[in-house]
Amino acid sequence: MAGPLSVEDMLAKQKAEKEAAAKPKFLSKAERQKIALEKRQSEVREQQEREDAERRQREEFDRAAEEERRRHEQERYGYNAGPSGRNDRDGYGRDGYGRDNRRGFGDRRDGSGPAIPSGPRGAALPVGPRSMQSRNGGGLPYDGFAQGSPSQLSSTPVAGSASPGPASTTASGDAVPPSQAELEALRARYLGKRTDGKKPRLRKAQDKKIIFDWNEQDDTSAADQSSWTREVRELVPGGTMFGGRLAGMDGAKKNETRSDNHADPLERRRAVKGKDDDRHWSDKPLDEMKERDWRIFREDFSIAARGGGIPHPLRNWRESAIPSQILDIIEEIGYKEPSPIQRQAIPIGMQNRDLIGVAKTGSGKTAAFVIPMLDYIGHLPPLNDDNRHLGPYALIMAPTRELAQQIETETRRFALPLGYKCVSIVGGRSVEEQQFALRDGAEIIIATPGRLKDMVDKSILVMSQCRYVVMDEADRMVDLGFEVDLNFILDSMPATFVKPDDSVALQPTKEGEWQGWRVTTLFSATMPPAVERLARKYLIKPATVVIGNAGEAVDTVEQRVEFVHGDEKKKARLIEILRTIGLPPPIIVFVNQKKTADMVVKYVQQAGMSGVTLHSGKSQEQREAALQALRDGEISVLVATDLAGRGIDVPDVSLVINWQMSDTIEKYVHRIGRTGRAGKTGVAITFLTNDDDEVMYDLRIEVEKSKMSKMNPELARHEAARTRVTREMKRKRGDEEE
């Protein structure tokens, strides 16, 4: 016999049980299937029990309702339903008189007299819908009055009875049978026959002639139409009152007059005065274009311009004031039609006016400022040994090295055939190399603000004759902290070329040479307050051109939003997209940190595609090599930070994936603007988490604006997408939770 357990044994046993419970238990496939089957059986059993309980509850409720109904009928009508069935609805039992007995007449076939009705309501006959129905539940059939009545009533009809109603009584209290008219009225009402006394109903025919229900011989409107109707028809040239056509009236002319009566009176007067026609603006020569045609033209291309004295936009290249040499270069490059920003910005630039251009990303802004700039330089004396040391004629500033080099490539396509030299000054390259490139001078310099400020500050480069300044992506330069550098560079230029408020851009001198005032052009995708402050300081009476709605994504991008939580799920979803979406490379994946880019590029390689990274940790040579490999098709996927999100033009990008949502909606717009360029369509997929609540509201608005995009239901229902969440609100919420 075992002795009592000691405390040590009990503690050891408890410890062993805890360890066994803490260890994971690995189940085989058969055990997992068995557990799943048992769980499913229990769920089915519980569902059946719930349904049985609901059915029993419903049956009890129906039974109680039936009992309550019977009790209510008994209290209301004063009868008691026997076990064999219910009494008649009108209060008559099975053994008494039925519905027809209450009418006071007998069977039509045997001619017997009516019997005296019995029951609690024998003194008055019921009328209304209940008197037309019988629910005797198995009583006597409808065959007249019941036989064997205690007494017979007189069958003589009452004279003068004209309306159906209950049987009248004599002075002695005997019931008087209804008259024949009353019987006919009851029979017609019971059978649902129409009566002649019904109110006429108004209906309309197809020929717009009003037709009533009365007889045609009662129509007095057609009796004599030879007098007043003829006068009315003659007084109304647009048409006759009752249809038809007057002699000598042309139907086509009548319709023309009627449509003209519905036209806009202001437009009709303008058409008569100016002899406008209805031809589309594309079918008219340039000299026949009216102000209305130009207004329609601007609406077609979503062009809005203000500033006074705005020239007409370009319809095509050959109708512009661009020199023939530049037009030949445009044709050689392959620009068939101007983009909307080019249509309006180039005519303004050809007037040498200061310009503010606000347009979407990928809208062709580079050519919009390069073409007027080359025309401006063409009026200045060529560079030689006497003036090349004074610096360039034109300066183009961009926020990033990649964008500056891209602008340099595009500018060279126009400038080299004209004999102009372009030099880029960007960070990441040695100053000596760039100084050597400037030894022979250059008409055009493309630079980033940081490196250009250093070279100007060290007197390596001077701006003594710079007269044409372009700031591309000005909002991005301000965001990157280059506002102070921009002010320093612009202030270092000579004030002698600053345009007075009442001057024109170019003034011819006595010698016949052009002495140009400085022209400043600013292009941006958005207009934050810092950019507006910069424009007010350095631009003189600028013309402002807005294409579409500033700061919106392009209409050719399909935006998709997916809620994906955790890096592992993002990894699996990224690999699935790259393998199954079926879009050709190049593809760009945007991240927020450099280390994330190095991690994501490995996932791209796991998906079977070649990838490369682009961020600030790469040298200038590595960045250029990465972009060139992507353009040449050697690399399929580029993983980049927001460094490449502005202005980088990689042709034919079909897909943009936001591995992480940007912290502002402006950056998101510029990211997805890498695809859907040059009239092509693209797809942008964004991985969203609950931590992105600060931008969910703006993101929902952007997706709703896009006609190509479909709203994610989870995003539409999210609380942060319905109400804007600020950083201060999140901070207060975190303090309350702590």
Curated annotation (Swiss-Prot):
Domain of life from the UniProt record: Eukaryota
Compositional bias annotation for Basic and acidic residues: 10-76, 86-111, 251-284, 715-738
SMART domains xref list: DEXDc (SM00487), HELICc (SM00490)
Keyword Nuclease: no
Sequence motif Q motif, residues: 315-343
EC numbers for this chain: 3.6.4.13
Substrates-to-products reaction catalysed: ATP + H2O = ADP + phosphate + H(+)
Residue stretches of biased makeup (Low complexity): 154-173
Any one Gene Ontology cellular component term annotated for this protein: cytoplasm
Domain Helicase ATP-binding: 346-545
Domain (Helicase C-terminal) ranges: 556-719
Transmembrane segments annotated in the record for this chain: none
Classification via Gene3D superfamilies: P-loop containing nucleotide triphosphate hydrolases
Major subcellular site: cytoplasm
PROSITE patterns attached to this UniProt entry: DEAD_ATP_HELICASE, HELICASE_ATP_BIND_1, HELICASE_CTER, Q_MOTIF
Function: ATP-dependent RNA helicase involved in mRNA splicing. May destabilize the U1/5'-splice site duplex to permit an effective competition for the 5'-splice site by the U6 snRNA, resulting in the switch between U1 and U6 at the 5'-splice site. May also act to unwind the U4/U6 base-pairing interaction in the U4/U6/U5 snRNP, facilitating the first covalent step of splicing.
Domain notes: The Q motif is unique to and characteristic of the DEAD box family of RNA helicases and controls ATP binding and hydrolysis.
Family to which the UniProt record says this protein belongs: Belongs to the DEAD box helicase family. DDX23/PRP28 subfamily.
Name by which UniProt lists this protein: Pre-mRNA-splicing ATP-dependent RNA helicase PRP28
Source organism: Cryptococcus neoformans var. neoformans serotype D (strain B-3501A) (Filobasidiella neoformans)
Gene name, Swiss-Prot/TrEMBL: PRP28
